[in-house]
Amino acid sequence: TGGYNLANEYFNITHPYGIWKDTGIRMEGDAVKSMTVAFLEMWNAAGNVKSKELVPEKYVINHAYQAQQRGYVQPYADSPLDGEQVGEEVYISMANKAEKYCWFITPYLIITDEMTHALTLAAKRGVDVRIITPGIPDKKMVYSVTRSFYHNLVKHGVRIYEWTPGFCHAKMSVADDKMATCGTINLDYRSLYHHCLLYTSDAAD
């Protein structure tokens, strides 16, 4: 899972926006089952053809895996069809639980008042809150809107950095060396509320 799409710029074969920065992780073990089922359910929902639906049981291997490390990985799916904002709630939860630091990387920053409140409140209580956004935009209008959020966040202690070598398409977060996320959800309305996406959260303790 991660931000990669199947296009040349994602692998720096072409360079329309400078150096393209993205992230992805390879999943192994039981967590893959959950992600496979979520993908197939969304595939079926989008296809809307009963006769061509993919049966999850056909693609999921029923095999027990021995954990290699402590902690857990929790895949989850977000969808505009169920009225729940799982992606945003996970980000807000991380900001609320963070004690030392909470860092985000996102290509677009267009957030709700609730997300803004969580980030600024964390910064006010002494948490090191940082956000990395692209220094070179792929969409100029969205880039302008992204920058319009800087002032209020910085005013309340959130640190914002722009990755200047090119376009940063990564969507990741990490907090206190205990919580981390990597997936396809940006910190923006469209991604948080209107995408059918897969995401994963990893807690080390």
What are the residue ranges of the model-derived segments?
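Charged, low-complexity intrinsically disordered terminal segments
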Residues: 1-201, 205
